[in-house]
Amino acid sequence: MKKSMPKPPRAFNEFSETFPTLRKAWDLLGDAAKEGPLDDRTARLVKLGVAIGAMREGAVHSSARKALALGIKTEELNQVVALASSVIGMPSAVAVWTWLRDSSAKK
C-alpha cells in the first residue's frame, strides 16, 4: 500500500506563500522531471543519490522522507550512502548518514 507523501517543512510552506510563482514553477519542474521510464521508487533513490553527491542536507532530508513514505526501507537508503562513499569520501558519507538517521527517526 502506497503511503501518502509527507508534508513539506514549515519553512518551505512559508517560502511558497511568500513566492507563489516560484512555487508554481517548482511544481511544474518536478512534474516534468517525472516523465520517463523510471518508476517512482527508482527515481526517488536516484534523487537521493544526487542530493548526497551535492551534499545538500535539506535535499537529503526531503528525499529520505519521501523515500520512506514510498515504503523504501532505511537499509536501502543506507546502501545509497555506502555506494556514494567512494565518491564523496568517508567524512562526507558519515555526515550524510547522520542526516538520514535524522529523517528515519522522524518517521
What does each model-found stretch correspond to?
Residues E14, P37, A51, A59, ...:
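Residue-level preference for alpha-helix termini and adjacent loops
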Residues E75-S103:
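C-terminal structural segments of small proteins and small subunits
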Residues R44-E57:
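Amphipathic, charged-and-aliphatic alpha-helical interface segments
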Residues T21-D27, A54-H61:
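Short acidic alpha-helix initiation/capping motifs at coil-to-helix transition points
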Residues M55-A82:
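Mid-chain, well-packed structural core segment of small domains
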Residues L28, G49, L83-S86:
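Residues within well-ordered alpha-helical secondary structure of globular protein domains
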Residues T42-L45, L77:
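Short runs of predominantly hydrophobic/aromatic residues within well-ordered alpha helices
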Residues M1-A43, L68-A69, A95-K107:
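Acidic, glycine/proline-rich low-complexity segments that act as flexible tails and inter-domain linkers
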